[in-house]
Amino acid sequence: VTIDHLFGQTVIKEPPKRVVSAGYTEQDDLLAVGVVPIAVTNWFGDQPFAVWPWAQAKLGGAQPVVLNLDNGIPVDQIAGLKPDLIVATNAGVDADTYQKLSAIAPTVPQSDGDAFFEPWKEQAAVIGRAVFQADQMKSLIDGVDQRFTAVGKEHPTWTGKKALLMEGALWQGTVVAAMAGWRTDFLNQMGLVIADSIKPFGTGHRAVIPRDRVKAVLDSADVLIWTTESPDDQKALLADPDVAGSQATAQNRHVFTTKEQAGAIAFSSPLSYPLVADQLPPQLAKILG
């Protein structure tokens, strides 16, 4: 197969057997189609072998080497693993690093200008093709779409309700929301819309809400989904005076995620989204009916 990407083309002559997952989330896409990488890259959450619970069973007892990007892509360590494919769609590859990696093995970097976190379906589809599993990956992606769409059909009263997808911790002393885009598509599929109130404060994928607008923004949404990772995160948010003093708090319009749910939303993968489709709707239903 031939993969087009930011730095040209990569030809992969046969199904790879020794795949290195060099970015933050590619392990999910590989495991989803039955490819167990020889190395994965840690992102967050301190999970065994940098693989979260929704994907652990797919490891089948394998113990991949765990890499990290703290000092950039560990080119020498990857070379020592003797891979036959390097998947680096979510690794911030630059031209120089691409040359070094592709001297080791065929390398699949980001498709275009998104150095990290290109839309999940694009990343999944490219990785599916790179490991000769394009059809299986397409059916997994379609399956995720169908799960969220089915939730929307089960809850017709959610249509048009305003939601905000919020970071689970304050950032520089204020709250941060996801802008409408691929990261919020799963909410749209369930019938929800992202509240317009964040638009003036958005750059790229996120909106940093000015402190004097926090209350008004929170109160503009019918439901607020905070991607908290612990009860302490929840306490810290509810201790914030503007969050505490909002109508959203008075009317109990907050959903606080578990660590695993927050991870699943962050990973946005064919393996993580089914967990979101199972666990988030009952929490939304408590607020939206």
Question: What does each of the following model-derived ranges do?
Answer:
Residues 26-77:
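A short, structured surface patch at a secondary-structure boundary
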Residues 169, 175, 202-231:
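Ligand-binding pocket segment of bilobal, Venus flytrap-like solute-binding proteins
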Residues 1-31, 44, 281-289:
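Extracytoplasmic low-complexity, Pro/Thr/Ser/Ala/Gly-rich segments
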Residues 9, 96-170, 266-289:
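Extracytoplasmic substrate-binding proteins
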